[in-house]
Amino acid sequence: MESRARCIFLLLLQILTRARGDILPSVCGHSRDAGKIVGGQDALEGQWPWQVSLWITEDGHICGGSLIHEVWVLTAAHCFRRSLNPSFYHVKVGGLTLSLLEPHSTLVAVRNIFVHPTYLWADASSGDIALVQLDTPLRPSQFTPVCLPAAQTPLTPGTVCWVTGWGATQERDMASVLQELAVPLLDSEDCEKMYHTQGSSLSGERIIQSDMLCAGYVEGQKDSCQGDSGGPLVCSINSSWTQVGITSWGIGCARPYRPGVYTRVPTYVDWIQRILAENHSDAYGYHSSASAAYQMLLPVLLAVALPGSL
C-alpha cells in the first residue's frame, strides 16, 4: 500500500512539475483569415496581431518581432548590433503603421535582451535569434501570441507560408503600412545551389547552415527586405499560425536566385523555453496558474501519499 501511494505521489508530482514549466500560452496563432516586403500587399487590421516593431528610442523602427508571450518578443540577434543596452530600445505593440498616434498601439520599454550565444555578430551567421523581455506585461486585450513549433516540426519544401514586416517595398523605400507576402518554403540544398550561382563571391563556402531556412521565389520579384529583419515567417499548422522562421538575411531584395534566409525556429525551441523558464514571473510579482497549483497541492500530496511525513 505504501509503495502504491509513493507511485501515485511521484506521478502527480511529475505532472505538476511539467505544468509548472509550461510557460508559453496554450491559446495562440489565431487571427483574421488571410506582404520590407517586396511585391507584397497591405495587411488588414488584426490579421497578424503578434507582429511588433522594435525601436531604437531616438531613431524609430529598426526591426520586426513577434509576441510569443505577454512579456516576451522573438526577434533576430543582428537587430542589436548597435547596443545590447535595454534602455536603447522600445517595442511598439498594436496597429498597422509605425505611427505612435495610431489607436490601440503602445510603446513598451525593454527590460532584458537575450542573444543566442552562438551568434557571431557577422553577416549570415548562425544563431541569429534573440528574445526581448518587456518591462511590463501586456494586458490580454493588447496582444495575441503566435504559436511556436515543436522541435521536430517538419518543414516541407513547397509549403506556402507568410512573412510580414514594415521593411522596404523596393530596395530603398520603407513601407508605411504593415506588409504581408506569401512565400513557399525551399529545400535547403536547392537554396544552397542558388546562392552559388550568378557570380556569387561565396563559392566554396557553405552558406545555408542547418539552423537556416529559405523561402521565396527563384525568379525573385517578391521577398522580405531591409526593415523586415527579426519579423516572423509563419505557416498554418493544425489551423493555427505557427512561427517557423525569423527574417535573418539575404543578398539584396527580391533578386533572382537569392531567396530570403530565415532562422529556423524549431532548432531553437528548447533554448527559448529555457530562457523563459529562467526569467519568468517572479520579477513581475505574479505566478502562473500551474505554479500556484503546484504550491497549493504539494502539501496535500505529501500528506496523502506519505502519512506521517508532515
From Swiss-Prot:
Pfam families per record: Trypsin
InterPro entries in the record: Peptidase_S1_PA, Peptidase_S1_PA_chymotrypsin, Peptidase_S1A, Trypsin_dom, TRYPSIN_HIS, TRYPSIN_SER
Reported regulation of activity: Inhibited by aprotinin, leupeptin, benzamidine and soybean trypsin inhibitor. Partially inhibited by PMSF and DFP.
Annotated tissue distribution: Expressed primarily in distal gut.
Stretches assigned to the Peptidase S1 domain: 37-277
Alphabetized PANTHER family for the sequence: PEPTIDASE S1 DOMAIN-CONTAINING PROTEIN, TRANSMEMBRANE PROTEASE SERINE
EC number: 3.4.21.-
Glycosylation sites: 238, 279
Function text: Selectively cleaves synthetic peptide substrates of trypsin. Activates the epithelial sodium channel ENaC.
Gene Ontology terms describing biological process: proteolysis; sodium ion transport
Protein's recorded name: Serine protease 30
One Gene Ontology cellular component: plasma membrane
PROSITE patterns according to UniProt: TRYPSIN_DOM, TRYPSIN_HIS, TRYPSIN_SER
Family: Belongs to the peptidase S1 family.
Disulfide-bond pairs as recorded: 63-79, 161-235, 191-214, 225-253
Residue ranges annotated as propeptide in the record: 22-36, 282-310
Localization, UniProt: Cell membrane
